[in-house]
């Protein structure tokens, strides 16, 4: 039914309509697109939390993956007046992870930064390796007061009170956490005042699972 709604709204948008009717169709387009995205996120969240997603672990170069996702989001970061600062560890630090799922984790975190980071500030993306553990860290200053504990931010549908007018389902961090843990990794958030930090860690050799 949702696909039919989206398709019919798309057909309406191509008709010659009075100005007031066209504005209504534009609202329908935006809201149906948001509903479609929410439905997709719900399906993904359900699959991730139940482990109903195939996982293929292999040595994954975090530096390459992090550089690629930063490149993908360069224009969007510029549009939000955010300055990316990329800091990579020594070459050769590979995580045992599923590259496809890890990309989805990083994509969710980047999307979160674009929505909630304060314009005109720097956002930090770092990779590090120590003690057989490889880690990716995202840091940004929030444009909204972080009035909620870090652990609650990872609950489904939870967003800060003042951010509810922004785009998004409130599922991004929950999905990122589930997908990370599905690969045997660790996902945690840290909040210090308005500083928001997301930390994703994986074993370098793949011999053990991590726990937050």
Q: Regions from the language model: what does each represent?
A:
Residues 30-35:
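Short alpha-helical segment of the dimerization/phosphotransfer core of two-component systems
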Residues 56-59, 78, 83-93:
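Conserved catalytic submotifs in the C-terminal HATPase_c
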Residues 56-74:
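A conserved beta-strand-to-alpha-helix junction within the catalytic ATP-binding
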Residues 113-114:
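Short helix-loop "hinge" at the ATP-lid/N-box region of the Bergerat-fold HATPase_c
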Residues 145-158:
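Short conserved segment of the HATPase_c
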Residues 184-185:
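Conserved glycine-rich
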């Amino acid at each position: 039914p949702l696909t039919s709604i989206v398709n019919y709204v798309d057909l309406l948008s191509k008709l010659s309509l009075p100005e007031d009717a066209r504005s209504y169709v534009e609202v329908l387009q935006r809201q149906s697109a948001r509903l479609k995205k929410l439905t997709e996120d719900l399906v993904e969240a359900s699959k991730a939390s139940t482990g109903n997603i195939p996982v293929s672990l292999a040595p994954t170069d975090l530096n390459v993956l992090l550089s690629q996702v930063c490149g993908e989001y360069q224009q969007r970061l510029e549009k939000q007046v955010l300055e990316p600062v990329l800091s990579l560890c020594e070459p050769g630090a590979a995580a045992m992870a599923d590259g496809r799922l890890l990309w989805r984790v990083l994509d969710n975190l980047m999307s979160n930064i674009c929505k909630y980071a304060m314009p005109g500030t720097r956002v930090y993306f770092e990779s590090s390796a120590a003690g057989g553990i490889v880690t990716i860290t995202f840091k940004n200053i929030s444009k909204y007061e972080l009035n909620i504990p870090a652990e609650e931010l990872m609950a489904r549908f939870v967003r800060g009170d003042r951010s509810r007018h922004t785009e998004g389902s409130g599922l991004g961090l929950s999905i990122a956490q589930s997908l990370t843990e599905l690969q045997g990794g660790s996902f945690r958030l840290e909040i210090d005042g308005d500083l928001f930090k997301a930390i994703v860690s994986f074993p370098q050799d793949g011999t053990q699972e991590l726990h937050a």
